[in-house]
Amino acid sequence: MKRWIMVLPLAVFLLVAVFLYRGLYLDPAELPSAMIGKPFPHFSLPAVEGESTLTQADLLGKPALVNVWGTWCVSCRVEHPVLNKLAEQGVRIYGVNYKDDNAAALKWLKDFHNPYQLNIRDEQGTLGLDLGVYGAPETFLIDAKGIIRHKFVGVVDETVWREQLAPLYQGLIDEGRP
């Protein structure tokens, strides 16, 4: 019995060390999403601009990025110029203005330009909840049928676009070509 008391702390230490060692090789930016491979959630929410109501059907037809953003999000301000540049290059981007005041969102888009073909107002965060959003910015890649193919958590900068999202986006574009 005395021997077990002496060995137990060593065994616990080794077990904890193995888990910590394994954690060194995990990517903290890579958060698994249960939504990958599933249709974009059904929603009926107002547009940020204008009086129209948008639904998931408005997102169908072509591959697109769906960017979750907010005026309160400092990182969103960092990625916004990259999104503007991508939109100028013809990349289809839809916005989800997450848990934000609509007047603030309109001012933001006026001040920093609007890269979004459609911009969904999600003031209560219901769509964000259905998407499994942890915060902002988060960007989803959807195919022409509205299936979520990829989720990226964090700032989409030029490196992230070039190395991660652009190849996936281009692959979806190529799938749709005859």
What are these regions (language model features)?
Residues 71-78, 138:
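C-type cytochrome heme c attachment motif
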Residues 77-113, 123-129:
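Structural microenvironment flanking redox-active thiols in thiol-disulfide oxidoreductases
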Residues 65-66, 93, 139:
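Hydrophobic beta-strand anchors of alpha/beta hydrolase catalytic cores
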Residues 6, 110-115, 122-178:
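Thiol/disulfide oxidoreductase modules built on the thioredoxin-like
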Residues 62-64, 68-72, 135:
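Short pre-active-site segment immediately N-terminal to redox-active cysteine/selenocysteine motifs
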Residues 43-65:
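A short beta-strand-turn-helix
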Residues 1-46, 178:
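N-terminal targeting signals for export/organelle localization
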Residues 42, 90, 116-117:
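A generic structural signal for alpha->beta connector loops
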